[in-house]
Regions:
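PAS-family sensory domains
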Residues: 25-27, 33, 51, 74, 81-83, 87-92
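PAS-family sensory/regulatory domains
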Residues: 41-55
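Sensory modules in modular signal-transduction proteins
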Residues: 1-21, 25, 29
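PAS/PAS-like sensory domain cap-loop motif
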Residues: 31-43
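PAS-associated C-terminal
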Residues: 114-115
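Short loop/turn elements at sensory-signaling interfaces that couple input to output
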Residues: 19, 86-91, 95-111
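Terminal output helix/cap of sensory domains in signal transduction proteins
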Residues: 54-82
């Protein structure tokens, strides 16, 4: 059976984000629905747009570095923010799990699941 990995990424039952230096370089439809934004509104943006504020973005960014350095995987439950749509700026609880592709530079590239 041939596997279409792009289709699997796009249709995954959880939100998926590919990041590079804490910027969104790819996301699936589920993330777009969760955050109330079109893909072209998210790709190219700092992940900061998904957080309720700059302080929370910085706090979580600093907190996950030693954990990703140690084991390459990080998970938590956190408050995130809708980007656009009729619920713009509404906050919601989200379970986030991520894996870095480089433990020595954890923000360099990663994949993140949002549930």
């Amino acid at each position: 059976m041939d596997v279409d990995y792009q289709l699997a990424f796009d249709l995954a039952p959880v939100g998926l984000v590919l990041s590079r230096n804490r910027a969104i370089v790819g996301c699936n439809q589920h993330v777009c629905e969760m955050f109330g934004a079109a893909r072209d509104q998210l790709v190219g943006q700092s992940c900061k747009v998904l957080y309720p504020g700059a302080a929370e973005y910085e706090r979580i960014g600093a907190r996950l570095i030693p954990i990703l350095n140690a084991n390459g995987v990080y998970a938590d439950d956190r408050i995130m923010k809708r980007v656009d749509g009729r619920f713009k700026s509404e906050t919601f609880w989200c379970h986030v799990t991520g894996r870095t592709l480089n433990r020595d530079a954890p923000h360099e590239a990663g994949i993140w699941a949002f549930e």
